[in-house]
């Protein structure tokens, strides 16, 4: 058992090649982007393109089996996230804004290193080298090279990797269960409240503005440090709207001064939010903590006891088709008037509460199958080895 710095077990640790990517293109050899590893795996649907057909110029930047990509410029929540490349039959160019680490075979297996990148020991070291700015966080390549890792003999690493593969099968099975439970909630909503488009249960319809308080937030000036530095007030953007219950923010906070000197406002727990612009337009969130938001989010607060937050949250997801009908091929945008005029069906609150009870049961099951449970097992396995 030895302790190494990452630089001592690597052929290289480097940033990618600078290539101007064409967002409208899907032609040529794909290039990695920050989003490529956003889910902790190589997502082949989130690669960039620049119409590159000849590989000669970029041959040295092609990923090889066992290469690990690391996010070193991102929101604090995603900083240090990694993904391992295991497909030698698919050419991908390593683009900038992700680090790539290629290990020395005789010292460590890539799969063992990827296990380390899931542990609290690694995350604590990342936290120490993180430099925060207003928009994002980052760490330098040189600081990353100094991170310490406990490395057992190769035969022990091999045994650990076999255990990991068993755990990953469990994880994959859990993902399928999570997907099933998400679909179960959607079908439950339709069974209880009918098809929203046709209103086949003939519920009375109001406009959102008649029953809900609708507003948006704001962004304190990023040129003024006192609005951001050492902030304690949670502040989120539309990237957090992913049709999910939101239990914490992604690392951005503003100060009291920032709140006072901007349109930002604090929304209470159980406020339903929806993205007005960007890649997540029409996607929703149900807040489970107090937070302020930026101007790209509409917040829906219930005026009285006629509606449950959970019902409203899933109703909005069923109204996503309205957002797809907005004009603009490349950049769609909704505004508060659009939200205010959305149709709001009015089933009895007793039925809504029954739906909420069932949703809570499903959410508990989803928690049981959450991949974080497996990540904890990874961490315990590494801790046992490195003790």
Protein language model regions, located:
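Non-catalytic DNA-recognition/assembly elements of restriction-modification systems
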Residues: 1-16, 146-161, 177-187, 191-219, ...
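Sequence-specific dsDNA recognition surfaces
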Residues: 7-22, 35-68, 209-225, 239-269
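A short glycine-rich beta-alpha junction/loop motif
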Residues: 19, 90-99, 108-111, 131-155, ...
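Short coil/turn segments at secondary-structure boundaries
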Residues: 19-27, 128-130, 201-204, 221-228, ...
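A short beta-sheet element
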Residues: 33-34, 55-118, 237-238, 251-317, ...
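Periplasmic-binding protein-like
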Residues: 122-127, 323
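Active-site region of PLP-dependent enzymes
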Residues: 131, 172, 326
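Hydrophobic alpha-helical bundles that form the membrane domains of multi-pass transporters
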Residues: 167-170
């Amino acid at each position: 058992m030895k302790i190494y710095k990452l630089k001592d077990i690597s052929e290289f640790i480097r940033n990618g090649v600078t290539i101007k990517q064409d967002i409208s293109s899907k032609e040529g050899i794909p290039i990695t982007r920050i989003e490529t590893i956003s889910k902790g795996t190589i997502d082949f649907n989130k690669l960039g393109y620049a119409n590159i057909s000849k590989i000669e110029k970029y041959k040295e930047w092609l990923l090889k089996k066992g290469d690990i990509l690391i996010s070193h410029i991102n929101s604090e929540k995603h900083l240090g996230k990694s993904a391992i490349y295991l497909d030698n039959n698919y050419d991908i160019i390593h683009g900038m804004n992700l680090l790539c680490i290629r290990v020395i075979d005789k010292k460590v297996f890539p799969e063992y290193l990827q296990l380390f990148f899931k542990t609290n020991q690694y995350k604590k070291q990342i936290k120490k080298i993180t430099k925060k700015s207003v928009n994002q966080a980052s760490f330098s390549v040189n600081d990353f090279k100094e991170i310490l890792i406990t490395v057992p003999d190769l035969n022990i690493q091999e045994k650990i990797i076999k255990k990991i593969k068993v755990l990953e099968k469990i994880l994959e099975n859990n993902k399928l269960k999570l997907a099933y439970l998400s679909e179960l909630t959607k079908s439950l909503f339709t069974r209880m409240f009918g098809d929203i488009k046709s209103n086949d249960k003939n519920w009375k319809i109001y406009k959102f503005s008649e029953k809900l308080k609708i507003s948006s937030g704001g962004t304190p000036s990023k040129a003024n440090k006192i609005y951001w530095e050492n902030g304690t007030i949670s502040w989120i953007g539309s990237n957090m709207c992913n049709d999910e219950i939101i239990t914490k923010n992604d690392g951005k906070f503003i100060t009291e001064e920032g709140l006072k000197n901007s349109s930002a406002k604090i929304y209470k727990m159980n406020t339903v939010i929806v993205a007005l612009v960007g890649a997540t337009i029409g996607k929703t969130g149900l807040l489970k903590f107090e937070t302020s938001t930026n101007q790209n989010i509409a917040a829906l607060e219930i005026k009285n006891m006629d509606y449950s937050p959970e019902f409203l949250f899933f109703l909005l997801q069923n109204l996503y088709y309205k957002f797809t009908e907005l004009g603009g091929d490349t950049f769609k945008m909704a505004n508060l008037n659009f939200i205010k005029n959305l149709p709001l069906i009015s089933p009895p609150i007793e039925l809504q509460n029954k739906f909420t009870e069932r949703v809570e049961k499903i959410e508990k099951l989803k928690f049981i199958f959450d991949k974080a449970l497996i990540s904890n097992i990874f961490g315990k396995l590494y801790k046992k080895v490195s003790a």
